[in-house]
Structure formats: structure tokens, C-alpha cells
Amino acid sequence: MTLRPWSVRRLAGPAVRPGRFVRRAAVLLVTAVVLAGCERGSSSGGPGESATGPSGCPADYDTARAAVARAERTDAPWRGPITGPRAVPGRSLVYVAQTMTNPGVAGVAQGVKEAARVVGWNVRVIDGGGTPAGIQAAMGQAVALKPAGIVIGGFDPNSTSQQVSRAGVEHIPLVGWHAVAAPGPSRRPPLFSNVTTHVQDVARISAQWIIAHSRGRAGAVVFTDASIPFARTKSELIRKELATCRGVRVLAYENIPIPDASSRTPREVASLLSRFGDRWTHSVAINDLYFADAAPAFRAAGAPGAGPPYNIGAGDGDPSAFQRVNSGQYQSATVPEPLTQQGWQIVDEFNRAFAGDPASGYAAPVHVSTADNTDGATSWDPTGYREAYRKIWGR
């Protein structure tokens, strides 16, 4: 295979020499070949025509550019709940985490704790460790504690169907975060509410960012975790949206479970760099952490931190993702979940359940964060929700 040392052409300064890059790329190629027999979970398009060729999608580009401009605004007012029951006192919650190494799961847990302090509730976090057995054990422990409510933190409730059934017998309401694809109540699995943005909106704006940023000419790689239904749905929608632009080609669809991301992502990225060279212009991942794990491979190849490839995370916008975006280190944008706000919403949904009220069903609008609109912040924390929820709860 002939390598295309695009990073040499785009890195300025005399210190970067083609010979040095080629030697680094050759090492990456050998490493990727050696590791090719190890665990892989990708499907890719063939070489095809270059995504930087003359074909584009003018109409789709204009639509994408306008949508991204709206999503980058930071001054939108709070449009979530403003009415509801006053705080029910003396309750306890158990937050069952898919894995606390998932920054989104961990960020929401902190939001739940913050809001629970306001209403005077107790919160216990149980880490499922990212494995089916661990999550089942964590759910079993949560039900055995007989709390007032249990949070399904970032995993498929169907994978713990026995424990979910036991919670139903004990009349323990369940509120999910990214537990199913749609926000609001769910009958199967039985959730009082599921807190999330609309996955269709997140997928669409992530793909539109690539279309707008590339002017409709890109070679993209999609990173996902197909073991999580929410993540799988998101990545499939991203791939579908990218396909609407004829000038964008999905080069590879990489299935890397989040618990394995730290070990697998670097070698998968090394392999992708050797396979696609300068055809790989953009990436999108269902979680920002993939780009933290990809950074060593990009550095080893001599890829510039500011891109290409230009990387966007389609969730969850944890502090490390913002740091990469703000410093131009292997991530250009993120579509962050308002993690703290969603933690507050989870507490509000439980309060509605305890009071006998219906769920609010609120879903936060999508937002795109780049170095140009974060003002150095390390999270997306929209304004107005704390005041609104405190007023609802009488706190």
C-alpha cells in the first residue's frame, strides 16, 4: 500500500521532514498489520473516488451551514419545565452507572448529586464497570437497597430485565439517562422517563457539521459502540445523514466498545491512517472519549492537532473533550449533552413520580461547541435551569 503523507504537506516549518514522517508511518503500518488479527469490529467502504474530488452537495451544504450556525448559539433561553410539584422530602436514589469511566455517565451522576442536595435527598452511585455481569450485579444491589428510585445510567435496561422486573414488584420507579433512544416515558422497558437529547437531532447536527466544515467534500470515519442501543442508533443515523451528501464518503465504521476504547482505539486509528492516508479528512464518534484515546496514534503519525482529520464528538461533551477542542488537540468540535442540567432533570422527573404527576418529557436542544464559542469553558451548561427547578421545588 502506498501511504499518502498528508500531514507533511500540512505541517509548517522546516523541522517536519517527509523522510521522518514516512518512517513513522511505516512503523504504524507494520504495527497495524501485526494487530490486524486481534479484535476488530469495523466495516469500511472501498477506496473509491477521493472525497476531495469535484463532487459536492451545494443544497445540503447550505442547509448544513445554517443548521450548524443555529446550534452554535450560546444565548438561547431556558425552554424546559417551569411548573411542577414542590419537592417531596426525605427520598433516596441509587444511580447505577454503565461505567464511571464513561465521562457522560459520570457527569450526569454529578448533576444528580448536585440537584439532590438542593432537595435534601441521598444519592448512592454503583458502578457497573462496563460489563454485562457487572451491570446486572449493580442493578441487583440497587434493587436490594430498596431506594425510592433508581437511575439507569447509560445502559440498556433490557440487559437487566430480571432486576428491572424486581424493581417493578417493589414499586421502585426507574428513570433512565440514554437508556433508550427516545426521551420521555417508556413502556418497554418500563421507565418513568428517559432523559436525553433527541438522538436524531444529535446525529443530524454531527453529520451536518462535517458537511458544512468540509463544504460537502469529506472522507469520514465513524466510531461507535454497537453494544449500547442508544449509541448504535446514533451512529446509524449519522451514517445515514452523511450519505445525503454525495461528496461525503464514509470510509470506515469502527465498532469499539467503550470499555475497550483505551486499548483498541490507538491501534485502530493507526490502521486507519495507513489504509486511508489523506482521504481521511473527518471523524465523528458517538462519545468524545474515542478522540482522547486516538491522540497517541495521531501524534505518532505526525498529524497536526488542529486537523486533518477534523474530529467531532457526538456526545457527551465532558471536560476533557472541551479541553481538546479549546486547545486544538485532535478534536475540533463536540455536540455536548448538558450533563449537569440532565442530572437536575432526573431529580425533577423522580420528584414528579413521587408526587404522582406525569413526567415532563423535556429534551434539551442540540448544541455545537467549538473553540470559537466556548469562551474557554469546559462544559456546556445552559442558563436558567437551576433557577427554574428551584422555583418548581420551592427551594
Identify the residue ranges that each predicted region occupies.
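Extracytoplasmic "Venus flytrap"
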Residues: G48-G111, A115, R124-A137, Q141, ...
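An alpha-beta-alpha
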Residues: L93, A97, V112-E114, D201-N255, ...
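N-terminal export and membrane-targeting signals
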Residues: M1-L29
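Hydrophobic alpha-helical
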Residues: I152-V169, I238, P257-R324
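C-terminal motif of bacterial Sec signal peptides marking the signal peptidase cleavage site
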Residues: V34-G37
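Flexible loop/hinge segments that line or gate small-molecule binding clefts
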Residues: A51-C57, N158, Q162-D201, D318-N326, ...
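Short beta-strand elements in bilobed, periplasmic/extracellular small-molecule ligand-binding domains
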Residues: R117-G129, L191, G219-V222, L242-S262, ...
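Hinge/cleft segment of the Venus flytrap/periplasmic-binding protein
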Residues: E39, S50-R91, P338-R395
